[in-house]
Amino acid sequence: MNVTVIGAGLAGSEAAWQLAQRGFRVTLREMKPEKISPAHHSSAFAELVCSNSLRGAGLENAVGLLKEELRRLGSIILEAADATRVEAGGALAVDRHGFAEYVTRALREHPNITVEEGEVTELPEGEVLVATGPLTSDALADHLAKLTGGEEAALHFFDAAAPLVSFESIDMSRAWFASRYDKGTADYVNCAMEKEEYLAFWRELCAAQEAEVHGFEDKNVFEGCMPVEVMARRGEDTLRYGPLKPRGLRDPSTGREPYAVVQLRKDNAEGSIYNLVGFQTHLKFGEQKRVFSMIPALCNAEYVRYGVMHRNTYLDSPRLLDRYYRLKSEPRITFAGQMTGVEGYVESAGSGFLAAVELARRLEGKAPVDFPRETALGALSLYISDETVKDFQPMNINFGIISPLGYRVKGKRNKNQEISQRSLEIIEKLKPEIVI
């Protein structure tokens, strides 16, 4: 049986792989390289358009739990991430080019996957899994809006990507390698700012000119990828309690904690490119260079890529989708990825995994897995399909949407690890039914 998967991002790539591994013939349709969105830079599958970090690796983090669930269940995205990992303290960060190439090669070489390039403007007949992501083309978005009732089913807001600089252009006499609280290895470049330097930077950042917006009707901002200039305008100290917080960092040149610290994280395996952590932005390119050069260690920084802002499109999933990411009104159509309202790289891959596994089981005449809310995979699918939610917003995985333990555990870290252990025990029991 053939299944059409539309979109070869994280969710679509994961879904196509899982279906193909289960013996289904998959037609993977991807608009790149024929048409490339403003946020994409290559024709590779599973391109990371924002940060190169898949966030926390430990089981005290909900996203760390989600990664471990996927890893144990045979996720191609986690396999690729582990194979292309770069040092990032307690986080799982990857060489973005190596990661995308790994996934692209795996899919193109799979005997059950046929790749068709070109824009899709309407859904084909038969079983379809739609994973066109936050950058769904206008034509397909219009088609989906009509398909889902002709209402405001798709909402628009902005995501933003941080600039990249060459390591050799960073003034390391004004910066140092360390991780916060010396946790893990010293993987971050830390750029200290004294009070006067920070305040001058903050004032210019607040006043800096943003790039012109074309073709968008609103500017709703999701907190997880908020532009640094928007955050700065919320108050003089907002950045110092956010991405520029100095806590846990001591400047070796002064022996004390700086007033503010800008952190840079390795963006490729070679360590030749670093990204400005938390500096997603929609400023004009010239303004980025002018304002960010006020950070002492970046006064002569060479920008490999300036920050950009792009649209995000997602469905009113509680009204439209069930816990298997299927369209309630037309179950032959399944959705996955950020357009369902899951937010983040790992969450997108997780939705693609669950959607594909449950789709395969339905087509095979098997009972659904029904991942429970005690697991991260189940919690996400139950969140996006919760009909009691009225003002639906995109959501990262977090322990708040996973079922509580039902008993007290002293300490937040211990409690979270206990929740993770419970989840992984459930995953191990489900594993024989799922893993191919």
Summary of predicted features, one role per range:
Residues 1-11:
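Beta1/beta-strand and adjacent pyrophosphate-binding region of the FAD-binding site
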Residues 17-79, 373-384:
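N-terminal FAD cofactor-binding segment of flavoenzymes
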Residues 59-63, 67, 75-88, 148-158, ...:
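A short alpha-helix-loop-beta-strand transition element characteristic
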Residues 69-143:
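Feature captures the FAD/FMN-dependent oxidoreductase FAD-binding
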Residues 109-285, 289-290:
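Predominantly flavin-linked oxidoreductase catalytic cores and closely associated redox partners
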Residues 276-342, 349-351, 369-386, 394-396, ...:
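A glycine-rich dinucleotide-binding beta-alpha-beta segment and adjacent secondary-structure elements
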Residues 395-436:
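C-terminal auxiliary extensions adjacent to catalytic cores
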